[in-house]
């Protein structure tokens, strides 16, 4: 298994375990999603924790495609309103996740 896939899976596993602080995010981590772009690990975690508590009931990995430094992870996000198909493009450097671009329909999610 590629290191990028291991880190992409750690991303999903950290949220499922309710331990986002344990996810190996770089200090200068950048996350882009339908809600916008957030830069900085702590700023991202402070912003996303309450959103995840309201909107995410489960995450189930369907498939990954990986190279040395990037991984696409397709997963289902369980929400109070049903299941949302998601794909995250995860970039890594030096054993940390440096960026994620998330693709999903946010129509039924609350900010």
Language-model segments: what does each one mean?
Residues 1-111:
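C-terminal and inter-domain tail/linker signature
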């Amino acid at each position: 298994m590629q290191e990028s896939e291991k880190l992409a899976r750690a991303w999903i596993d950290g949220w499922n375990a309710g331990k986002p602080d344990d996810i190996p995010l770089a200090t200068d981590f950048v996350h882009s999603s339908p809600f916008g772009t957030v830069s900085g690990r702590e700023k991202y975690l402070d912003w996303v924790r309450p959103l995840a508590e309201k909107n995410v009931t489960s995450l189930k990995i369907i498939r990954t495609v990986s190279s040395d430094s990037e991984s696409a992870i397709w997963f289902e996000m369980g929400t109070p309103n049903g299941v949302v198909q998601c794909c995250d493009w995860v970039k890594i450097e030096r054993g940390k996740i440096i960026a994620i671009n998330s693709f999903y329909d946010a129509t039924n999610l609350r900010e």
